């Protein structure tokens, strides 16, 4: 009798450990996916090192900026005798390029854009392409060789943005955990499928459009109104979880549907954020 009790306790502890491991693995996969998405996304600053006048010049150029201010460009540890310029124009237009001279203050080059004449275009979703040009002794270096694309966005209330980020991360976490339930002999697909669908609905289909309205003036720019990949990939994940949730009640083998929805979610959320995002129409 005593042996059976001990065996039962070990089994309970074993299952608890297994469940904890499922959540740990789900968290690591989700965190890794989120980090990769942020690191490779089009809003992550463009950075690198170039050689000019025999010295390495490090740069970090923003690719996103709030409409409440100009985009600031700064290069540090520069030879005080080097001149710098920002060359910019509106993205995908026939505008003439504008050249803004940078101020060299003790080895720090800095300037901002757009200039007063272009400030009317500093609106949500407006994109600019720009780069820095260094000049000294008839030598010139363009940093980087291909212009950086910067997009302006409206200010999103911090509370709304934080809630959105937390809920979306939770949706990815629960989605991944639901997929791992496929490897649990006592799987509860209904519970995880419904939770994943509910959180995905709140984060992606409710809070997502609200954040986008603040940032870019539009609630939805995916299908059928546009090709914005952020909206479209959210829509695909949402539909996948609707299918998985229905299958968890009706299918004889719901595990494959839940695992499939989890894999779809993981793959599409690994795609860089804001790819194929809109650009304010030229007027």
Per-region residue spans from a language model:
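Glycan-association/targeting regions that enable binding to alpha-glucans and other polysaccharides
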Residues: 3-169, 175-176, 182-185, 254, ...
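Small-polar-interrupted transmembrane alpha-helices in polytopic inner-membrane proteins
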Residues: 195-214
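Membrane-interfacial loop-to-transmembrane alpha-helix junctions, especially the N-terminal start
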Residues: 188-201, 253-261
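Non-cytosolic membrane-interface motifs at loop->transmembrane helix junctions
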Residues: 157-163, 218-231
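Hydrophobic cores of alpha-helical transmembrane segments in multi-pass inner/ER membrane proteins
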Residues: 2, 166-177, 233-248
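Generic detector of multi-pass transmembrane helix bundles and their immediately adjacent loops
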Residues: 234-283
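Juxtamembrane "helix-exit" motif on the non-cytosolic side of transmembrane helices
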Residues: 209-220, 274-278
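Alpha-helical transmembrane segments of multipass membrane proteins
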Residues: 29, 203-207, 268-272
């Amino acid at each position: 009798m005593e042996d059976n009790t001990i065996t039962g306790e070990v089994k309970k502890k074993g299952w608890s450990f297994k469940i904890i491991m499922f959540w740990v693995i789900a968290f690591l996969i989700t965190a890794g996916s989120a980090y990769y998405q942020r690191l490779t996304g089009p809003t992550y600053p463009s950075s690198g090192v170039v050689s000019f006048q025999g010295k390495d010049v490090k740069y970090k150029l923003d690719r996103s900026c709030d409409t409440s201010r100009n985009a600031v460009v700064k290069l540090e540890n520069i030879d005080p005798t080097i001149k710098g310029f920002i060359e910019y124009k509106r993205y995908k237009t026939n505008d003439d390029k504008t050249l803004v001279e940078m101020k060299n203050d003790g080895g720090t080059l800095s300037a901002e854009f757009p200039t007063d004449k272009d400030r009317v275009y500093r609106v949500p979703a407006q994109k600019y392409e720009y780069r820095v040009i260094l000049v000294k002794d008839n030598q010139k270096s363009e940093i980087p060789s291909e212009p950086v694309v910067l997009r302006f966005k409206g200010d999103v209330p911090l509370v709304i943005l934080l809630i959105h980020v937390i809920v979306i991360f939770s949706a990815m976490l629960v989605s991944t955990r639901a997929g791992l339930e496929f490897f649990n002999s006592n799987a509860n697909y209904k519970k995880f499928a419904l939770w994943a669908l509910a959180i995905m609905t709140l984060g992606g289909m409710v809070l997502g459009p609200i954040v986008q309205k603040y940032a870019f003036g539009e609630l939805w720019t995916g299908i059928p109104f546009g090709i914005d990949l952020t909206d479209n990939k959210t829509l695909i994940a949402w539909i996948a979880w609707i299918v998985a949730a229905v299958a968890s009640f009706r299918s004889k083998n719901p595990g494959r549907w839940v695992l499939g929805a989890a894999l779809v979610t993981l793959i599409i959320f690994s795609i860089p954020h804001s790819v194929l995002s809109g650009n304010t129409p030229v007027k």
